[in-house]
């Protein structure tokens, strides 16, 4: 019941985020000093919408989403400030980031939506605003989050590293279907649930000190499912345990070594 209720709440949030008209205030400067997105209220499903444009940078301090079918080019960084919300996972869009995506303490970073059958065995998450649509998101640098409340990365191309350290909350963390040209590092997170699934990682994948707290299902574990890792897959301190998936054959494919709790998941 708790899981169903949470799913319903998250669905409502996603739909509201996708369909909300711009509210609050936002400052755009095209290719000038950048764009600061303010306003919105995540608690009431009110969002400021970021429109199509080329920006020097984007800074998110409020609750912000992406316009339906927007084409956004950011020559520098996207910064989600502490407590900010960036919902780029509810409406189809094309987003290209020249440098890095950085999420601060207590923030929510959501990137990517697609038809269910685009990732693994129906592991994709459809765009709430247009279920048959999809996002195309490319980050030419790194994606990093420090003490974030929630991080959702689905079918994102990252030409650098993905580094997630600390934080967590009542929303499941999902790192799935991504292409990561360097390393994936996830550490010191206590969240409802966390899954690293169906990713292609050119370097190492290191998951340490992660706790899944889902109160509705005591059997819930950290999921490490069908990733292709060119170098090493390393897992330590995953509580209450680690799962390799429910379908036979959903093992991870590792070029060098699988160590720790993930040694048996290859």
Predicted regions and their residues:
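Secretory targeting and sorting signals
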Residues: 1-29
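Hydrophobic alpha-helical membrane segments, chiefly transmembrane helices and signal peptide h-regions
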Residues: 12-22, 142-145, 246-251, 255
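Extracellular beta-strand-rich, repetitive "passenger/adhesive" scaffolds
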Residues: 33-52, 63-72, 83-96, 107-138, ...
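Fold-core signature of tandem repeat domains
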Residues: 74, 78-80, 97, 101, ...
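General marker for long, soluble alpha-helical cores
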Residues: 163, 185, 206, 211, ...
